[in-house]
Amino acid sequence: MASSTCYATIPAMSCRGQSTITRFGPNNLFLGKQSYELPLMRRNAKFTVRSMREDNEKEEQQQQKQQQTHDGGPDLTPNRTEVTTKRTVDLFSFDGLAPERINGRSAMIGFVAAVGVELATGRDVFSQVFNGGVMWFLLTSAVLVLATLIPIYRGLSPEAKNNGFWNSDAEIWNGRFAMIGLVALAFTEYVKGGPLINV
């Protein structure tokens, strides 16, 4: 009679088996009576898992805020859309709030200024840039960067004032068209070799 005992590395898992040899069969195959016992694995349920969607939390916060305003009177705080991040690195990342807005605002001002100066003096975009335009570009860019970042650092997002004709979507699309228009104006004047509008 042979007996064997094995223990695994996982706690609470062990096996004990007993094997009784009864005979050898043809071709020397082992035939025997085997019995193995495995204890029940018990779960250690000392913790609970809770999963919630963020939407539910936001809805609950809005409901609580509405209940407070109904109970205590009108809400006098300004309507602010919360900005989740205020790190400058995150704001200037590829999908951040700042890059497209700053570039769009610069392009809108730049396009209007380039066409206005061209109509007034007859100089093309390149002569405007090389004759004092770089200083104006740097000054305007600094003002636009500050004008874009200060409200974001104060907790306002561009979508906070989305009512009426002036909204953030219109600003984004106007900025995109101005970027395309400014590049097209410079390219056309480069190919033509002079100002687009001759005065």
Swiss-Prot record:
Keywords: Chloroplast, Membrane, Plastid, Thylakoid, Transit peptide, Transmembrane, Transmembrane helix. Residues 1-52 form a transit peptide. This is Desiccation stress protein DSP-22, chloroplastic. GO terms for cellular component: chloroplast thylakoid membrane. Induction: By light, ABA and desiccation. Residues 53-82 are annotated as: Disordered. Belongs to the ELIP/psbS family. Possibly exerts a protective role during water loss.
